[in-house]
Amino acid sequence: MYRVFRLPANQAAKADLLLQDDLVSRQSVVVRDAKSLGIGGDDRYVLVEGIDAAIARASELLKDGGKALTGTEAERVYHSFRSQDEDAVSGMGMIFGP
């Protein structure tokens, strides 16, 4: 399970709360600026992948400043995260060979 959150630029430091929380920090937590994902604006996006309890905890930690994305917007941003990961893996393969 995953959830994507959007944090306005003035709330970007709240992403650190996820990395400091015992439960959430044990999951996959990826933080990216909007521009690095090819999305306009100065927002910061956070992808949390893991167990349901950790996703719920992340939602609770970010409720005062972050917005959990839903529907096509969440899917679009999630795809941007995955595309970056795939590009990185592809680049490593070109460096080290098959």
Give, region by region, the residue ranges found by the protein language model.
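Conserved short beta-strand edge segments in small beta-sheet-based binding/regulatory domains
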Residues: 28-32, 64-83
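Short, flexible, solvent-exposed loop/turn segments with mixed acidic/basic and small polar residues
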Residues: 1, 29-41
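Helix N-cap motif at beta-to-alpha junctions
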Residues: 8-12, 49-56
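Short, low-order "capping/linker" segments at domain edges
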Residues: 78-98
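Short amphipathic alpha-helices in soluble, non-transmembrane regions
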Residues: 16-23, 56-67
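Long, compositionally biased, intrinsically disordered regions
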Residues: 3-14, 68-72
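Long, non-globular segments of proteins
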Residues: 1-2, 13-17, 81-88
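Short amphipathic alpha-helix segments
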Residues: 7-34
